[in-house]
Amino acid sequence: MSHIIELPEMLANQIAAGEVIERPASVVKELVENAIDAGSSQIIIEIEEAGLKKIQITDNGHGIAHDEVELALRRHATSKIKNQADLFRIRTLGFRGEALPSIASVSVLTLLTAVDGASHGTKLVARGGEVEEVIPATSPVGTKVCVEDLFFNTPARLKYMKSQQAELSHIIDIVNRLGLAHPEISFSLISDGKEMTRTAGTGQLRQAIAGIYGLVSAKKMIEIENSDLDFEISGFVSLPELTRANRNYISLFINGRYIKNFLLNRAILDGFGSKLMVGRFPLAVIHIHIDPYLADVNVHPTKQEVRISKEKELMALVSEAIANSLKEQTLIPDALENLAKSTVRNREKVEQTILPLKENTLYYEKTEPSRPSQTEVADYQVELTDEGQDLTLFAKETLDRLTKPAKLHFAERKPANYDQLDHPELDLASIDKAYDKLEREEASSFPELEFFGQMHGTYLFAQGRDGLYIIDQHAAQERVKYEEYRESIGNVDQSQQQLLVPYIFEFPADDALCLKERMPLLEEVGVFLAEYGENQFILREHPIWMAEEEIESGIYEMCDMLLLTKEVSIKKYRAELAIMMSCKRSIKANHRIDDHSARQLLYQLSQCDNPYNCPHGRPVLVHFTKSDMEKMFRRIQENHTSLRELGKY
């Protein structure tokens, strides 16, 4: 029978370390938060080998008194709270007194500290949680904590560490979040002698954003603010033109503490409304100041999850703050860009009826579609009047061709035994079999469509032999573009187009680090970025399959996708890249196109390997048969048939 015993202090600390200290980034987080609570205005983080060999945090805070240094390494020893009431009004980042003893239990820890007015400082050395020495030492006011050989006595934890690049990325992300949470503090992160991140510590949030995300991104962010009796909201969000492929660039802080909250993320997106594309997310740095009594941070070991009273009111306040700030922005660049790409149809001239005679049909086998000459258009352009003036012969012929049913080219296809159909000895069963085969071929082919209109700048209407077809113009062009890109990206042409003015791309330090590791994937699709300055890359030439006007947005999109890829597969990456590029370059909803462009799109769609679905799997067209239409208008009756059953994909 096993007996209940009290665990030794060191073992208890190691158990606590399993919850609090997951990786080197956890050590950085806990020690930097202690430095912030100590009132520091400057914090320097130095690491070696992604923190596994060494992590050193130096601050200019209040320091620790000589007689309290050893006590700081005991569990639940803290200066942050004194009684139970303090637990419900936490104003500091730390309060449990677990971090320092947990870190010391799985590393070799050296602490050097001094307080203002003391004759000397104090040095403490601990190994695996056991204090080896505490001696007087010379030290400036503040604290320096050096953590070496992390997880040396817990090899199982060390075994599951990721690559140094991945661990370094986590550390950079932690420091970036802390820098955004406290713009009044100067942060500096140095990895193996190279500075990765620096913030000025001026107290200006926009300057902190510029130091982390770059000046270009900071300029494209707008200020937000809102408040009520319980909450005060401030911060910056990006304009709709600056987005990312994931939520990693959304930072929420409550009383200076970085938190993760799904509902508040939802509120941010609601504030943008329809201004964001599907699958795109803004950059956001939002500070929420709240009475500590309304927030419970003691619900998770890492303290990143917070329970908030009046959460619905807070969500509404965040959404309102963002929506109000966006209303004040003209967003003219987006409007001009859309206007430049749009085509407005001329509704005043009847020359719309004088169309290429063969463009109503989509399959051209031997002859190319011909357009009437400019002379023909001038000679036969006719103005329609209410008196019903006679049209010229040419105009009548044109209208006659438009109103005739489209030619069914697939009906002209000959089966393999076509010549045998006229054979006098061929029986009726063979003839029926041949026709059945012909019908199957017709059913499996894309229908011949005759375009006749557009609705709401989004849907195209066309008729075929067997009824009405409604086509989603965005999905249709997305399918066309996808198959083009799939071909061009799948077989990368090494030909490059030289740029007169190179493009400079800037990323946060953790993203830049990850991109360096995965750069060969970009090169596989013909994109060659070279390092250029701190956390910057330069593009001097671009692949010929990429349009020059889409280089900047396209490269950022590709890099975003690359950063999301956890298991690198060039085949999967190329497929996802083709989908992304096709979606971005396709016609959007509420975009009117002229008749010629619509017919051309339908022709291109008919040539696709799979014209029925967009790359995301959504249907491209919906079909209503003539019989379906007659049922809708009750021209014929059929029992137990609902309108929902009439649409067919």
Curated annotation (Swiss-Prot):
Transmembrane stretches, by residue range?
Answer: none
Query: Which Gene3D superfamilies does this chain map to?
Result: 3.30.230.10, Histidine kinase-like ATPase, C-terminal domain (3.30.565.10), MutL, C-terminal domain, dimerisation subdomain (3.30.1540.20), MutL, C-terminal domain, regulatory subdomain (3.30.1370.100)
GO biological-process terms attached to the record: mismatch repair
Q: Which UniProt keywords apply?
A: DNA damage, DNA repair
GO MF, one example: ATP binding
> What's a GO cellular component annotated to this UniProt protein?
mismatch repair complex
One Pfam family named in its UniProt record: DNA_mis_repair
Q: Which InterPro entries match?
A: DNA_mismatch_repair_CS (IPR014762), DNA_mismatch_repair_MutL (IPR020667), DNA_mismatch_S5_2-like (IPR013507), HATPase_C_sf (IPR036890), MutL/Mlh/PMS (IPR002099), MutL/Mlh/Pms-like (IPR038973), MutL_C (IPR014790), MutL_C_dimsub (IPR042120)
PROSITE patterns associated with the record: DNA_MISMATCH_REPAIR_1 (PS00058)
Q: What does this protein do?
A: This protein is involved in the repair of mismatches in DNA. It is required for dam-dependent methyl-directed DNA mismatch repair. May act as a 'molecular matchmaker', a protein that promotes the formation of a stable complex between two or more DNA-binding proteins in an ATP-dependent manner without itself being part of a final effector complex.
Say which family it is in.
Belongs to the DNA mismatch repair MutL/HexB family.
**Protein name, per record:** DNA mismatch repair protein MutL
Instruction: State the organism named in the record.
Output: Streptococcus pneumoniae (strain JJA)
